[in-house]
From Swiss-Prot:
Expression induction: Induced by growth in high levels of dissolved inorganic carbon and low NH(3) levels (at protein level).
Protein's name according to its UniProt entry: Ribulose bisphosphate carboxylase small subunit 1
Family as reported in the entry's similarity comment: Belongs to the RuBisCO small chain family.
Other known facts: The basic functional RuBisCO is composed of a large chain homodimer in a 'head-to-tail' conformation. In form I RuBisCO this homodimer is arranged in a barrel-like tetramer with the small subunits forming a tetrameric 'cap' on each end of the 'barrel'.
HAMAP family assigned: RuBisCO_S_bact
GO molecular function: ribulose-bisphosphate carboxylase activity
A GO cellular component entry from the record: cytoplasm
Location of this chain's protein in the cell: Cytoplasm
Amino acid sequence: MSIQDYPSRLSDPQSRKAETFSYLPKMTAEQIKAQVQYIIDRGWNPAIEHSEPENAFSYYWYMWKLPMFGETDADAVLAEVDACIKANPNNHVRLIGYDNYAQSQGANMLVKRGDM
């Protein structure tokens, strides 16, 4: 049995992975919308956070406005994602689905990778 080395190096920012979907090809707009709809369909509260790429691996990200409690329109969530990206064009932007029942994050994904 051989062990495959993943070519990620601290010296190479492009090789760093963040969140589950970063190991897959970049998501299309339709795929991101499907993930937003998944969050909404489960009754989770969508929220958007952003951070400078150099601070992305610290614990604190800036919250974009408040979580969208009770939001049922995926397009409204995506409009806020776009507004966050326009206001913070060089930052990573992630979408979170807060699960009230489990009192935790049910989903957490990077929807825009910042410039490194």
